[in-house]
Amino acid sequence: MNPDGVEQSELKQPVRIFTPADVDVLMKVININRNSGNFADYYVTMAASNGTYTLKFTGTSADIRVGYGTDEWKDHFNDYCKTWKKKYGFEKTFLTYLRDVMQLSGISLYKINSNDTIDQVTLTVNNKIIKTPCP
């Protein structure tokens, strides 16, 4: 394990986007290092079935919350995905869940494209996905 982040590359079945448990791993790493004050160094990266994604913590110590690695969160997220993924796709489904259900802020989603460019994927207040190229 990298001291600042975690990479997840084992695919037992097609994985399309992060889950609450992945968010929990990120939050736990940050919580352990809460006194460092430099939260921008923490991330979780995964190779998903539709690309490589990174979650990066961009919040403050007030945004650190753990406890999302439970079966209850897993089951609820699976049900949520069954309802919304066909309509919204996985990026929008995940970001909506993060904002509306988990009520988390201070976490940014990035997609590493096949041409090695990186886009920050954000959700507007009108629930539209915006992909902003990173410099």
Model-derived features: positions:
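Active-site-proximal loop/helix of nucleotide/amide-processing enzymes and allied scaffolds
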Residues: 1-135
